[in-house]
Amino acid sequence: MKPVTARKRSGTGATVNQMELRPENSEHLQLIRAYEAGSVQIGESFYASSFLLAPARSPVEWQVEQFSQINESDFAEILTLSWDVLLVGTGDQHYLPDLRLQRMLARAGRGIDFMSSRSACATYNLLALDGRAVAAAIILPLRASAVTGR
């Protein structure tokens, strides 16, 4: 596909600046296409339980059902993978890890952000489309109100 060029003209008809728009190519990315109370859609597949999603890797089940259960061993696998930013979807609500877990994750020396699972799904796509090496650990299922915002 050929790039599109947009030109902004001043009142005199002269070109003031130019911006080249290129079609987005996201074929190689595993993007979160939809999320609802009972599942998340990644590509053509649906996931109804918590999962880990990392660059160049198929999603795998994550054995965490709620944030209050989370501990250091739950991050062992994902910390061995290659990524720059990890988004941890904490379920229906935004939670922060306890001090012990914060210290362990800080030693990993990479960006780790905690947010609601709904926010993590949306943020994952934005970062992936921006070319960032992003991973996500998403706790499911969500209540219907967490998805709709009501």
What are these regions (language model features)?
Residues 60-62, 94-97, 123:
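Short active-site-adjacent helix-start/loop capping segments
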Residues 2-73, 81, 129-150:
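Non-catalytic interface/targeting segments
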Residues 117-122:
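Short acidic loop-to-helix transition motifs that present clustered carboxylates
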Residues 78-115:
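Mid-chain, well-packed structural core segment of small domains
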Residues 123-129:
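Conserved phosphate-binding catalytic cores of ATP/NTP-utilizing and phosphoryl-transfer enzymes
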